[in-house]
Regions:
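Sec-dependent bacterial lipoprotein signal peptides
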Residues: 1-21
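Short, low-complexity, disordered segments immediately C-terminal to signal peptides
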Residues: 14-15, 25-49, 53
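An extracytoplasmic/periplasmic, membrane-proximal ligand-sensing/linker region
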Residues: 54-56, 66, 207, 282-329
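Acidic helix-start/capping segments at beta-turn-to-alpha-helix junctions
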Residues: 88-106, 113-118
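A structural signal for short loop-to-beta-strand junctions that line the ligand-binding cleft
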Residues: 127, 138-160, 259
Length: 329
């Protein structure tokens, strides 16, 4: 079950953003971007010229488009609110993310609730489709590492199993149950951690009694689409908010998770306790406010602009912030 911020929380966050806007300077040159998804067409608030006193914020972005967009959204909103913030590009896997927190190279990053829990509990299968329940299990594990989970968004990005329209039509596959019945010999292309990820090969084995481990090809996220289109693999794992899923010309079929294997991978800001302790509500108001606005449909559209339309992450972030009345670049 996707967790939606309560009305009381939303009112508080909107009020907090009004205070941020009121505190901003008088620079009339700030312009809104030319549109994100599902927006109200608002303009970005003017940014403050005052600086927050405290440690610099280093935001970790993993090497895929969605992470780059989210990192830009965080960075631009924080910079507008007077924080010294920058982005550090990391590798594509969660062990590098946590290593960067441990070393102090980063102190903030966008991440995903269920995947974060399963990484820290050694893929014990504790994550559920209820984000509140999953977050309750995650919180003490983060505390042990000196980290804190801020408010998760409504936006969910979990694993998505896709085949080409041709494969779907030929074999009659539209669900993961169909894949288990008719696709045991198909080749699966996914990131290397699919072998241990509870929402990939182990999940297919546990929930669908489907073992594709012998037909598994480890691939970087970035090459999976081309590998699928070219026939090098038969089934590809992409993010459920992959922008190509919103493009009818892609020619993919998203296989329905009809037995609910996948869990609550809501996007949330992951921060060091040192960072939240230094800035308190000044920091969390900005980040929680972003989470209160972000939806799955919007994130999918933002990814389409990056992956299909080839827009830059910083421009995508700027227009999304403007559409939601949150200060940006």
């Amino acid at each position: 079950m996707t967790r939606r911020p309560t009305t009381r929380l939303l009112v508080a966050l909107l009020a907090a953003f009004s205070l941020v806007a009121a505190a901003c300077g008088d620079d009339d040159d700030t312009e809104a971007g030319d549109g994100g998804s599902g927006s109200d067409g608002g303009e970005a608030v003017e940014c403050t010229e005052d600086s927050q006193s405290g440690p610099a914020i280093s935001i970790g972005a993993q090497d895929f488009g969605e992470s780059a967009i989210l990192a830009e959204i965080y960075e631009q909103a924080l910079a507008c609110a007077g924080f010294e913030a920058g982005i550090q590009t990391l590798g594509g896997f969660r062990d590098l993310l946590f290593g960067s927190f441990d070393s102090g190279d980063i102190n903030l990053a966008p991440d995903y609730v269920a995947s974060n829990l399963e990484f820290l509990n050694n893929f014990a299968g504790e994550a559920t489709s209820d984000v509140d329940e999953t977050l309750d299990k995650l919180t003490p594990l983060l505390e042990d590492k000196g980290l804190v989970a801020l408010e998760p968004s409504e936006a969910v990005d979990t694993n998505a199993f896709v085949v080409t329209q041709e494969t779907s039509d030929e074999l009659g596959i539209t669900t993961l149950s169909d894949l288990a019945d008719k696709g045991q010999d198909l080749t699966l292309g996914a990131p290397p951690d699919c072998e241990t990820n509870g929402f990939c090969i182990p999940g297919l084995q546990r929930v669908y009694d489907l073992d594709l481990s012998e037909n598994f090809v480890p691939l970087d996220f970035g090459v999976i689409p081309a590998s699928l289109d070219e026939g090098a693999i038969d089934v590809g794992v992409v993010g459920s908010t992959d922008g190509r899923l919103a493009d009818p010309d892609t020619g993919w079929v998203l296989l329905e998770d009809d037995q609910q294997m996948l869990a609550a991978d809501n996007v949330f800001p992951l921060a060091s306790e040192e960072l939240t302790g230094a800035y308190g509500d000044d920091l969390t108001t900005v980040l929680d406010g972003i989470s209160a606005e972000l939806t799955t449909d919007e994130l999918t559209e933002l990814n389409k602009r990056f992956d299909v339309d080839k827009e830059d992450a910083d421009a995508i972030a700027e227009s999304w912030l403007a559409d939601h009345g949150i200060g940006g670049a």
